[in-house]
């Protein structure tokens, strides 16, 4: 099939007059229920004239996009019934929430899920009343909506979620409505390229439906105003075959849309049939639909002398004063009665039988499709024993390794054992992040042209790489929401590109947890590497650890942040995260050569606790003895610098009782009243004391540690070092010095904070200042760090040899 192939308006119609009449009535029923949800408190079937008490005092909702969504839904039901198709519906214009609720109700799913809202007049009254009403449901296609995997509040992610749902679902078709406003967003523009990653043999299909109703909130849309030939050329350039449906006469549009959907589904079947018949898999040209209908179609044409239907004025509530303005109320009643509710519902308020017969049944209903409640389909990963990948550690700090390279061997075998339910996403960084061992079990999925020098590209790869963090996260979210597992690996600084996507996913999870009918899904797992302390070669643009702060702002029951200090702890944490459900897990780990501290048994015990005293690095060892100072650390580089500082202190001040505490699970720092992983006060005080100085070396921005610990008894004695936005292209040790996180500055902090040391150890303090100057001078002269610093390792000493 040629990329130049184009189809415009389909000829003919597969609908008989009877079928057309029924589909039109079904559409009218959905529109009626949609308007009722926006406006009505009572009198759902208009058994009496509308009065002020029948109308909501606050009108909230969006009408403009809703009739278009309802139109597509009605016609997809016909496709599902006629072809026994497995279809879910993703609505980019999620503000058309009343439409999706209406259709779930018409199919009977809503009453099955929410048993108090029956299919009768009283059920209709409750359905209408709850919409955008205190104690009710939100205005968008949120998690409360049966059949939804995409809320559509923040625009841009519909298409990428749809493709994520289709991956590894060979018999699923994801119909995805894209609003012409949403089409102006960056993620959506990139999302068109997802077809280059869709394997027609092993994946399902996505049917994009570009809804051109012409307007956003208050402005025209770009794609609706360019010449149609230019629009078609754009879509063909993306690799699609557009089929256009256009008009404002319902009868004509029904006939066009029925023909267009038949043509599109025939095209999908032909593509998949050819690909699955054997032979080389090539990238096909998938069909899509361009749907041009008026915004606010079937609503008021004119309100207060101004055009509404077909304009931006129909975006939200076309009649805004129906509670207090009799003219608006009369116009609302006329609007509602125009749908002929007596033709759609019987006297008891039930959808008439001939219309109910238009909806699919059971799991084929889009509102009841198990793919849209992915936890129903979720199977545990078949995970290898992570202990088999352990880094041998005979004594702490004596072995050098690359933590993410170690993890890559584990992930290789995770992929090998779960080829139908696990994918790894990365924005062209998987090899850079030293995870390339995975290519021993899989390739990178790629259906476009290849060149002889390309490596690891294949149509059926498990790794997905595209230089768009939005696509990586969106694909993974769609994959998870439909019952699968995955991992998103990313440079730490650039994961900020998807900050708002994380926000939206967290909101979805929070709501889903409150809905007993929504089953738990696999956690959204981030692996952040190439992190702030080892981006000395790329400079300030690549140095930002603030994603942790964003995650920490989210609801405690959803978020977990892990900072494993070495490869064995990283393996333990990764295994835990891949087994978890309904969380957002953030793992921050280094990729550069670094010291390994814990053997596997010790790593498992340490990660299980989440934090703990490293006895082998401490000099405060006597039973019952209080330390003079606590050196705490979280993150691989802060751990290195803390241990180096402890090494200096034990040599220079052998009588100083130092306790080293390492933190893997950052949320352990909070009280147990604030986070499920939080430490009770008595346990926190036992580790960090109630009155001794705590010098805390932290991977990210220092203020987060203060936020997490501000209720602790010893907070006034807590002094945190971390990233202070001092960065450039320099050496690794110069980076930590720029931010006062280096070993010499940590020693200075101890001398300044422990009572009596300032004067007694004045010479040591001066030597630390001199050591910092010397280290910086060395970099300026040689262009690298002093080998004595760069090659430092932990050596046993008499005072802590018992545990070594």
UniProtKB/Swiss-Prot annotation:
Entry-linked Pfam families: XFP (PF03894), XFP_C (PF09363), XFP_N (PF09364)
Domain of life, per lineage: Bacteria
Gene3D superfamilies assigned to the protein according to its UniProt record, in alphabetical order: 3.40.50.920, 3.40.50.970
GO biological process, one term: carbohydrate metabolic process
HAMAP family (UniProt xref): Phosphoketolase (MF_01403)
E.C. designation(s): 4.1.2.-
Keyword Lyase belongs to the record: yes
Entry similarity comment: Belongs to the XFP family.
Disulfide bonds: none
InterPro entries xref list: Phosphoketolase, THDP-binding, Transketo_C/PFOR_II, Xul5P/Fru6P_PKetolase, Xul5P/Fru6P_PKetolase_C, Xul5P/Fru6P_PKetolase_CS, Xul5P/Fru6P_PKetolase_N, Xul5P/Fru6P_PKetolase_ThDP_BS
PANTHER family cross-referenced by the UniProt entry: PHOSPHOKETOLASE-RELATED
Species of origin: Mycolicibacterium paratuberculosis (strain ATCC BAA-968 / K-10)
CC cofactor: thiamine diphosphate
GO MF annotations, alphabetized: aldehyde-lyase activity; magnesium ion binding
Keywords for the protein's UniProt record, in alphabetical order: Lyase, Thiamine pyrophosphate
Enzyme class, broadest EC rank: lyase
Name listed for the protein in its UniProt record: Probable phosphoketolase
């Amino acid at each position: 099939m040629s990329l130049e192939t184009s189809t415009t308006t389909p000829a003919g119609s597969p609908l008989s007059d009877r079928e057309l009449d029924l589909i039109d009535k079904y559409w009218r029923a959905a529109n009626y229920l949609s308007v009722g949800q926006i406006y009505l408190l009572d009198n759902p079937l208009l058994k009496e004239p509308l009065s002020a008490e029948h109308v909501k005092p606050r009108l909230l909702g969006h009408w403009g996009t809703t009739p278009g969504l309802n139109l597509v839904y009605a016609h997809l039901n016909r496709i599902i019934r006629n072809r026994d198709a497995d279809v879910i519906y993703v609505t980019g214009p999620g503000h058309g929430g009343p439409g999706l609720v209406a259709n779930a109700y018409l199919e009977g799913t809503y009453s099955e899920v929410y048993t108090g809202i029956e299919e009768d007049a009283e059920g209709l009254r409750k359905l209408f009343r709850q919409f955008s009403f205190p104690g009710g449901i939100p205005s968008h296609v949120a998690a409360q909506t049966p059949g939804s995997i995409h809320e559509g509040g923040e625009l841009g992610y519909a298409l990428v979620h749809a493709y994520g749902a289709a991956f590894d679902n060979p018999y699923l078709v994801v119909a995805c409505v894209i609003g012409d406003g949403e089409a102006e967003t960056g993620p959506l523009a990139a999302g068109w390229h997802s077809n280059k990653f869709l394997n027609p043999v092993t994946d399902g299909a996505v049917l994009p439906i570009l809804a051109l109703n012409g307007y956003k909130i208050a402005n025209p849309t770009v794609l609706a105003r360019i010449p149609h030939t230019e629009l078609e050329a754009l879509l063909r350039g993306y690799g699609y075959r557009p089929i256009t449906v256009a008009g404002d006469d319902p009868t004509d549009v029904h006939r066009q849309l029925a023909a267009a959907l038949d043509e599109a589904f025939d095209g999908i079947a032909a593509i998949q049939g050819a690909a699955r018949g054997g032979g080389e898999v090539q990238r096909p040209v998938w069909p899509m639909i361009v749907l041009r209908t008026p915004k606010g179609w079937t609503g008021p044409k004119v309100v207060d002398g101004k055009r509404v239907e077909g304009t931006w004025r129909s975006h939200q509530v076309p009649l805004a004063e129906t509670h207090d303005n009799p003219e608006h109320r009369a116009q609302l009643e006329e609007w509602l009665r125009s749908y002929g509710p007596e033709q759609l519902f019987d006297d008891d308020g039930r959808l008439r039988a001939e219309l109910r017969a238009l909806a699919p049944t059971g799991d084929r209903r889009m509102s009841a499709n198990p793919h849209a409640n992915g936890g129903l389909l979720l199977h545990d990963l078949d995970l290898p024993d992570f202990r088999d990948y352990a880094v041998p550690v005979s004594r702490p700090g004596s072995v050098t390794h690359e933590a993410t390279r170690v993890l890559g061997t584990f992930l290789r075998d995770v992929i090998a054992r779960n080829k139908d339910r696990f994918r790894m996403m990365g924005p062209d960084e998987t090899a850079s992040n030293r995870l390339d061992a995975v290519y021993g079990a899989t390739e990178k999925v790629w259906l476009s042209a290849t060149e002889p020098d390309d490596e690891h590209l294949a149509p059926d790869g498990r790794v997905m790489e595209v230089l768009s963090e939005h696509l990586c996260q969106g694909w993974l979210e769609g994959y998870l929401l439909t019952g699968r597992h995955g991992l998103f690996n990313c440079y730490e600084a650039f994961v900020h590109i998807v900050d708002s996507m994380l926000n939206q996913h967290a909101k979805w999870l929070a709501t889903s947890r409150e809905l007993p009918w929504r089953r738990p899904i696999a956690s959204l797992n981030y692996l952040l590497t190439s992190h702030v302390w080892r981006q000395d070669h790329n400079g300030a643009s690549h140095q930002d650890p603030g994603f942790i702060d964003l995650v920490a702002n989210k609801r405690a029951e959803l978020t977990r942040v892990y900072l494993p200090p070495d490869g064995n702890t990283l393996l333990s944490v990764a295994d835990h995260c891949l087994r978890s459900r309904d969380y957002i897990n953030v793992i921050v780990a280094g990729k550069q050569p670094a010291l390994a501290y814990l053997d596997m048994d010790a790593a498992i015990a340490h990660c299980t606790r989440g934090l703990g005293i490293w006895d082998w690095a401490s000099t405060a060892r006597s039973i019952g003895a209080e330390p003079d100072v606590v050196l705490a650390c979280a993150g691989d580089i802060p751990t290195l610098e803390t241990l180096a500082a402890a090494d200096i202190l034990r040599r220079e001040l052998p009588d100083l009782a130092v306790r080293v505490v390492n933190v893997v699970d950052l949320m352990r720092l909070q009280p147990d009243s604030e986070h499920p992983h939080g430490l009770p006060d008595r346990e926190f005080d036992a580790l960090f004391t109630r009155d001794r100085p705590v010098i805390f070396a932290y991977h990210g921005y220092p203020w987060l540690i203060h936020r997490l610990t501000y209720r602790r008894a010893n907070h006034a004695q807590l002094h945190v070092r971390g990233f202070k936005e001092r960065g450039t292209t320099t050496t690794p040790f110069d980076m930590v010095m720029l931010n006062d996180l280096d070993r010499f500055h940590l020693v200075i902090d101890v001398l300044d904070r422990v009572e009596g040391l300032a004067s007694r150890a004045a010479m040591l303090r001066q030597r630390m200042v001199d050591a910092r100057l010397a280290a910086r001078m060395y970099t300026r002269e040689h262009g690298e760090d002093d080998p004595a610093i760069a090659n430092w390792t932990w050596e046993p000493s008499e005072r802590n040899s018992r545990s070594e």
